[in-house]
Amino acid sequence: MEKGHSDLPRQPERVAQNPFLTFDQDSFPSSYGSSLNVSEQTSGSSSTSPLPQISCLLRKDDVPLANKELSRSLIHVQELSRYPPFYNQDHQHLGVPRSRVGSDVWKMREKSFLSPSQFSSIDLSWVYRSKEEDDDFHDPKSSVVSLMGEEDYLGWSRFCDLFFLFVLSLGIGLLFIVFPALTFTGNITPSKEKFDAIMANQITDHLFAHMRVPRTNLIDKDTPSTAYHRTGYNGRKYNLVFSDEFNKEGRSFYSGNDQFWEAVNIHYAATNDLDWYDPDAITTVNGTLAIQLDAFWNRDLNFRSGMLQSWNKLCLKGGIIEVSASLAGSGEHAGLWPGIWTLGNLARPGYMATTDGVWPYAYSQCDVGITPNQSSYDGISYLPGQKLPNCVCLNEDHPSPGVGRGAPEIDILEGSTEKLHPDDELDIGVVSQSGQFAPFDFFWLPNYDYLAVYNDSITHMNSYVGGPFQQALSGITTLNNTWYGGNAFQIYGFDYKPGEGTNGYVSWFVGPNYTWSMLGSAVGQNGNVGPRQISEEPMSIIFNLGISNNWAYYYFRDLSFPAVMYIDYIRIYQDPDDTNSHIGCDPPGYPTTKYIEEHPLAYKNPNATTWEMAGYTWPKNSLMHKCNT
């Protein structure tokens, strides 16, 4: 044997032992045996070493073990003896070190211990038929043990568990199967044949995203029949062609959620707004459309508000547009900028690449008026020129070659305040009702012979007539300070007829009274610039509530937030005998939707500020590039 091997423990030899065990009746209960003391014999040594005392909990009726089985169990006991003996002299064998004896956590009854030598013969069913004081698992009456027992135990606890699983499964099925099936609206791009005659003839081919219960008529079912007709500025009878009463509670105007309206998610950088327009700021409540301006930090801006547009969904050309509104805040303090206005559909509000070269052009001539800065060095115009004049070169990018196109603006109102007298402590509310035009008259001065103010005690012409980006004709009308904050509503709107010269006009009104009017001749031919038009373009509709120092300096301490502008309804009327009137974004001779679809990089990117930045080239024209048209 090599050196060092003698120190290793020797493998014991297996010996046959008496299979019959003796019981000490004085030490243990009558139903269990006593401690077992067995000697181990090893080859090469006559000495004996006692094995540790191990309690053998045997019942008297156990079948004696065969010698082979007993020898195997004794070998196992011998192997266990190499570790420190864990026992208690009080015969409560715990199987734990003595340092833990006496702990409440580790106390167990003596019948819970099994010697390894009895695993092959003891009936283990007593484990779950005996009650354990601190463990429900060993309580036969517990619902936990009933799963292992021979007889089922179905009590109220188990019944409640099963009932809960049933309800949970039913709820999941209703949520993910039944509810989607009930709310599915069917074909989201139905053919026009499925709509009524008005919808089939006048709605565009715009494809809408998923929406809940789309309308199949342009007239809201909640509009009273008494509002189906109205007398126009020209004395003719007009018919209702579109209405939205905003009576359905909790409408959402996120992209794709509504047929006619969409709330934008942009910063309106064109006017240096101090707020971010968020769709979450707009909803319907108590039968009104509510646009809420909040004063909190949002996307690196101090305010959050909303802008609702009908761009490329709902447009009008000619007729009367009427809105019932209660303006935000109070007429006593300046600072807020409520707006209800219309814009040519070729420009998407807030997307500056789309307004580049089209706002606020209402022009169909081929002269100096279409050139950058109107070819003038006096700073009268900073506009880049008309992008879509009537004289673009052959095969250039144009929605309707031969027709001058643009995006003029007509405002139903822009809210502000002013003092009736210089020494007044508080302001009073006013609205500006205006039209924006390009190219410009000399020093932006219109021909006042073609303007009319109907009551100069409450309405006067605005001294602001324009700047390098627009020519503005505006009338200022005094309001009642109760028409704010949802306390009372008032009607605002305009009646207009597209055209040049005396063929076109715009008349604004507040309540039942017209405030002021202009004929197209007010912006007729003037020097090097030809006649501008009362808009021939399909006009989209915009509601917004903003705050900007471009409009009015605000004193934060005088304003109250949140400020809410409420819209009760919007209604559009048109003369049934006027063939030039149209509801929709593609009137004859003035299409827009196809052109918009062909230029997605501009119309879907609010961060592009010029047409070239969006990746498109400026169309050439015969005046500047000497080409064929």
UniProtKB/Swiss-Prot annotation:
Q: Where is the composition biased (Basic and acidic residues)?
A: 1-13
Q: Which InterPro entries match?
A: ConA-like_dom_sf, GH16, Skn1/Kre6/Sbg1
Q: Where is the composition biased (Low complexity)?
A: 39-52
Q: Which residues are glycosylated?
A: 286, 373, 455, 480, 513, 607
Q: Which GO terms describe its molecular function?
A: glucosidase activity
Q: Does the keyword Lipid biosynthesis apply?
A: no
List where in the cell it is found.
Endoplasmic reticulum membrane
Q: List, as start-end ranges, the regions of compositional bias called Polar residues.
A: 24-38
Residues on the membrane's Lumenal side span 183-629
**A biological process term (GO) from this entry:** (1->6)-beta-D-glucan biosynthetic process
Q: What membrane topology does the annotation report for this chain?
A: Single-pass type II membrane protein
Query: Which UniProt keywords are listed?
Result: Cell wall biogenesis/degradation, Endoplasmic reticulum, Glycoprotein, Membrane, Signal-anchor, Transmembrane, Transmembrane helix
What cellular-component terms does GO give this entry?
Answer: endoplasmic reticulum membrane; plasma membrane
CDD domains tied to this protein? GH16_fungal_KRE6_glucanase
Predominantly, its location class is endoplasmic reticulum
Disulfide bond in keyword set = no
GH16 domain: from which residue to which, for each copy? 231-578
The UniProt entry's sequence similarity note says: Belongs to the SKN1/KRE6 family.
Against PANTHER family, the record matches this protein to: BETA-GLUCAN SYNTHESIS-ASSOCIATED PROTEIN KRE6-RELATED
Q: What does this protein do?
A: Required for synthesis of the major beta-glucans of the yeast cell wall.
Q: What protein does this entry describe?
A: Uncharacterized beta-glucan synthesis-associated protein C23H3.11c
Q: What is the lineage of its organism?
A: Eukaryota, Fungi, Dikarya, Ascomycota, Taphrinomycotina
